[in-house]
């Protein structure tokens, strides 16, 4: 099973950016924990981070025929990007949206997700564990 992991804008700043909101783990730390779990599950991961909406759309579109699912933290694009939402919908790949913080308990503008309605589900508020829970959800979904 192959899963594409996508990290959106500013996630490359984790560990130093608002640690009271996002925690002290770096993106490399999160990727390492994902790789450990993937190894246990027998899942192959491809991990990509970009601050560019177009680059993320390109990666999503290129996933068709190469991946069995997408694990995505769209970050700020969660609330603004119809392009990312449409790209995910067009792939028809099982997709889980994850967030480090609980987007529903934050500022009003952060509570709306363009991705959630077309995703298998959304996991938020569990810090780095949101990613691990999302990977397990995709794995279990694809095993059926």
Swiss-Prot record:
HAMAP family recorded: AroQ
GO MF terms held by the record: 3-dehydroquinate dehydratase activity
Active site residues of this protein: 22, 99
Pathway per the UniProt entry: Metabolic intermediate biosynthesis; chorismate biosynthesis; chorismate from D-erythrose 4-phosphate and phosphoenolpyruvate: step 3/7
EC nos: 4.2.1.10
PROSITE patterns: DEHYDROQUINASE_II (PS01029)
Matches recorded under InterPro entries: DHquinase_II, DHquinase_II_CS, DHquinase_II_sf
Enzyme class: lyase
Function field: Catalyzes a trans-dehydration via an enolate intermediate.
Catalytic activity annotation: 3-dehydroquinate = 3-dehydroshikimate + H2O
Lineage: Bacteria, Pseudomonadati, Thermodesulfobacteriota, Desulfuromonadia, Geobacterales
Residue numbers binding substrate: 73, 79, 86, 100-101, 110
Gene3D superfamilies: Dehydroquinase, class II
Superkingdom of source: Bacteria
GO biological process: amino acid biosynthetic process; aromatic amino acid family biosynthetic process; chorismate biosynthetic process; quinate catabolic process
Family affiliation: Belongs to the type-II 3-dehydroquinase family.
Quaternary state and interactors: Homododecamer.
Name used for this protein in its record: 3-dehydroquinate dehydratase
UniProt keywords, alphabetically: Amino-acid biosynthesis, Aromatic amino acid biosynthesis, Lyase
Signal peptide residue numbers: none
Site residues by UniProt (Transition state stabilizer): 17
Record organism: Geotalea uraniireducens (strain Rf4) (Geobacter uraniireducens)
